[in-house]
Curated annotation (Swiss-Prot):
Listed name of the protein: Olfactory receptor 2M5
Keywords of the record: Cell membrane, Disulfide bond, G-protein coupled receptor, Glycoprotein, Membrane, Olfaction, Receptor, Sensory transduction, Transducer, Transmembrane, Transmembrane helix
InterPro entries: GPCR_Rhodpsn, GPCR_Rhodpsn_7TM, Olfact_rcpt
GO biological process, one term: detection of chemical stimulus involved in sensory perception of smell
Membrane spanning residue stretches: 26-49, 58-79, 101-120, 140-158, 196-219, 237-259, 273-292
Alphabetized Pfam families for the sequence: 7tm_4 (PF13853)
GO-annotated molecular function: G protein-coupled receptor activity; olfactory receptor activity
Broad class of where this protein is predominantly found: membrane
Gene Ontology cellular component terms for the protein in this record: plasma membrane
Provenance organism: Homo sapiens
């Protein structure tokens, strides 16, 4: 393999997204602020769901997994970018690059499948409420979540191994702020066209299959909501489902733009901007989308904060 023919001293160079101009310095600290909000928001939501027994339901268990994935996603890219910017070093080892690719791809892939599981959960809750506790019992819910993690990890292993099976004998400057395999393939001195075609097909399958489940689930959900007699029940169902659909739209919209395009149509700046949205903004927005209009979450937060004040 080409991996064996390359030394680990041959680091890659991450060109990053910011220079040291005043404007870019401001944008860098803005990204750090967004990262801090995303880190705190996702951490708080995971802890809140864990601590409050009333949130120990399939829906909130799945949400906790989404927040955990988002938390790991931002931690796999932003800290290295910040370290490189502040230290003036732009290098990343081959092992570090492979690690970033694995975590980044596995977490995105896992979220892809998890969002489909979450839509199925809403379909069962709204269209088959009497069978919900049986169809979404903890064992089944846990298995579906585990499969989401496993499928995402398998995809990441394949992508990472395939990416580093190519030789990189020319420039080692990656036009990105983290290691992403499309940016690496551009640097390869091998013909990567076959791998890119296989990658394209895999991306289509990984996106189309979950999207088909989401569309089918929400088509039934919308029909059920329309025929609901209770105004309160309709409002609650609409609030929950609209939050999920907003996240699905952001996630798959950015994913389609990022990975379905052929390499020849890629612009480094476009990739960077979409990646900032994908890896930083979306993890920040998810806790806000799911919590701002959710009475159960706000109640749990007040309960935890109330206990903290009493403890003081």
């Amino acid at each position: 393999m080409a991996w064996e023919n390359q030394t680990f001293n041959s680091d890659f160079i991450l060109l990053g997204i910011f220079n040291h101009s005043p404007t870019h310095t401001f944008l860098f600290f803005l990204v750090l602020a967004i990262f801090s909000v995303a880190f705190m928001g996702n951490s708080v939501m995971v802890l809140l769901i864990y601590l409050d027994t009333q949130l120990h339901t399939p829906m909130y268990f799945l949400l906790s997994q989404l927040f955990l994935m988002d938390l790991m996603l931002i931690c796999s890219t932003v800290p290295k970018m910040a370290f490189n910017y502040l230290s003036g070093s732009k290098s990343i080892s081959m092992a570090g690059c492979a690690t970033q690719i694995f975590f980044y791809v596995s977490l995105l892939g896992s979220e892809c499948f998890l969002l489909a599981v979450m839509s199925y959960d809403r379909y069962i809750a709204i269209c088959h409420p009497l069978r919900y506790t049986n169809l979404m019992r903890p064992k089944i819910c846990g298995l579906m979540t585990a499969f989401s993690w496993i499928l995402g990890s398998m995809d990441a292993i394949i992508d990472a191994v395939a990416t580093f099976s190519f030789s990189y004998c020319g420039s080692r400057e990656i036009a990105h702020f983290f290691c992403d395999f499309p940016s690496l393939l551009i640097l390869s001195c091998n013909d990567t066209s076959i791998f890119e075609k296989v990658l394209f097909i895999c991306c289509i399958v990984m996106i189309v299959f979950p999207v088909a489940i989401i569309i089918a689930s929400y088509a039934r959900v919308i029909l059920a909501v329309i025929h609901m007699g209770s105004g309160e029940g309709r409002r609650k169902a609409f609030t929950t489902c609209s939050s999920h659909l907003m996240v699905v739209g952001m996630y798959y919209g950015a994913g389609l733009f990022m990975y379905i395009r052929p390499t020849s149509d890629r612009s480094p700046m476009q990739d960077k901007l979409v990646s900032v949205f994908y890896t930083i903004l979306t993890p920040m927005l998810n806790p806000l989308i799911y919590s701002l209009r959710n009475k159960e979450v706000t109640r749990a937060l007040r309960k935890v904060l109330g206990k903290g004040k009493c403890g003081e």
